[in-house]
Amino acid sequence: MTSEKGPSTGDPTLRRRIEPWEFDVFYDPRELRKEACLLYEIKWGMSRKIWRSSGKNTTNHVEVNFIKKFTSERDFHPSMSCSITWFLSWSPCWECSQAIREFLSRHPGVTLVIYVARLFWHMDQQNRQGLRDLVNSGVTIQIMRASEYYHCWRNFVNYPPGDEAHWPQYPPLWMMLYALELHCIILSLPPCLKISRRWQNHLTFFRLHLQNCHYQTIPPHILLATGLIHPSVAWR
């Protein structure tokens, strides 16, 4: 039975939650909103407590804002262990990827997991290399799935009373397409996902352009999961 309560007024994270409409416009994978949003969780050492908050673009990207805030507000010993999870509306650009790597090199006790709703200018070679460098540095990067969207809705959104289960359920195809392109990036393959926007009716179009190298390198079950590849396609 669905609870008739929204986030409790006694919830210490309530003032740091975003509104439902903000979550929708920032994290809908079909939208190409320019601004970025970051929802994050921090867990220190062996503590079970999780610190949650959010951030948005200012004059800097949200990733840089987080790093500045994190390093300035706490006397953080480099050897202290800390687990950080980011839920980003856009993947980091190459400059932010470099800043993240520098931050992690100065704080070897920090582990970082990044979930992204969309890939930022994924055709740009510098952005692609930046994401590969992060992965090679030990950062986990994944596309947000339904479970991550629900987690964010429950823990970061000031949803109305009774609407805990009424989180936005976006079509899984968009998530699968972005996940496929992320595989291409990590494996140093050419882009396979083309994205275009028709501004008159605000529709976003996704198109797959697979080459032989994609069929040769990407596991078949990942390609088949999109539902756009026929099982009879010959893998070489």
UniProtKB/Swiss-Prot annotation:
SUPFAM superfamilies: Cytidine deaminase-like. Zn(2+) binds at H61, C93, C96. Belongs to the cytidine and deoxycytidylate deaminase family. Keywords: Cytoplasm, Hydrolase, Metal-binding, mRNA processing, Nucleus, Zinc. Its EC number is 3.5.4.-, 3.5.4.36. The keyword Hydrolase applies. Expressed exclusively in the small intestine. GO terms for cellular component: apolipoprotein B mRNA editing enzyme complex; cytoplasm; mRNA editing complex; nucleoplasm; nucleus. Cytidine deaminase catalyzing the cytidine to uridine postranscriptional editing of a variety of mRNAs. Form complexes with cofactors that confer differential editing activity and selectivity. Responsible for the postranscriptional editing of a CAA codon for Gln to a UAA codon for stop in the apolipoprotein B mRNA. Also involved in CGA (Arg) to UGA (Stop) editing in the NF1 mRNA. May also play a role in the epigenetic regulation of gene expression by participating in DNA demethylation. It is found in: Cytoplasm; Nucleus. It comes from Homo sapiens. It is an enzyme of class 3 (hydrolase). Residues 10-134 form the CMP/dCMP-type deaminase domain. The active site is at E63. The gene is APOBEC1. This is C->U-editing enzyme APOBEC-1. GO terms for molecular function: cytidine deaminase activity; mRNA 3'-UTR AU-rich region binding; RNA binding; zinc ion binding. Binds 1 Zn(2+) ion per subunit. PANTHER family: C-U-EDITING ENZYME APOBEC-1, MRNA EDITING ENZYME.
